[in-house]
Amino acid sequence: MIRFDSPNERSRNGNLLLIGARAPVPGACKTRLGAAIGMATAAALYRAFLVDLAARFTADPAWATRNYDVAWAYTPDVDFAAVLRGCGCAAPLSPVGFVLQEGEGWGARQANLLRWGDVHGYARTVLVASDAPHLSRDDVGQAFAALERRDVVIARSLDGGYSLVGMRGYHDILSGVPMSTSSAADALVARATSLGLRVGETAAIFDIDEVADLDLLIGTLEPDGAAAPATWAALHSLGLLPETAVRRTAG
């Protein structure tokens, strides 16, 4: 079920961005990362991811030029608006939706969310996870632009999976796709192609799933963390920045 703060201001050009997210509870989010740095530390870092994504996609004054609605696709079944407020997320400047994830497994939940967009009147639906605090508005804009010419769009992650998936209408492109494997993106493309669909790809977007991904994130955000300030501050306060970056931050 979806709720927008201002129901009469929905459906910007028929485009919907869904941001998949979890309540930032230790042991229930970023567990692979938490196995290396501690579950409480991983959850604290993930809270900062949510703050940065909310600032960029729901609380930025540039919203007036955006051509898509935004909704949080959340789990578990909690008051996710309250969760975001508790994380310190800025109040949205635009109508924001909330959609509960439903289904057994991430593949089924993705399919249900993408189907939801189609059933509720969106011509194009793009789904991203909340594992990349550096995800930019340009990344999302390129995905919607690709869907003007293609039926399906993906942005690959660096591990063989994908960080973004979108489609025009709804097609069963996720059946048989092995989630969280190094062949997930290739399998999705093969499945979509077998259905006669045109697939577009945008620039790869790396996720923060493993401790090694933190080095990529830090390198992307250096020198000052301006692209994701809450995440940069959390990396600093949690002791996850290398000493050279700490000195630059302090300076």
Can you name each region flagged by the protein language model?
Residues 1-33:
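N-terminal nucleotide-binding beta1-loop-alpha1 segment
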Residues 46-65:
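A short, N-terminal amphipathic alpha-helix
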Residues 66-76:
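Short beta-strand/loop segment that forms part of the nucleotide-sugar
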Residues 82-124:
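Short phosphate-binding loop-to-helix
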Residues 126-128:
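Short aromatic-hydrophobic micro-motifs that form the base-stacking/packing surface
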Residues 133-159:
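Conserved donor-nucleotide/metal-binding helix-loop-beta segment in metal-dependent transferases, i.e.
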Residues 171-191:
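Short, glycine-/small-residue-rich phosphate/pyrophosphate-handling segment
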Residues 190-251:
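Conserved alpha/beta core of the MobA/IspD/sugar-nucleotide pyrophosphorylase nucleotidyltransferase superfamily
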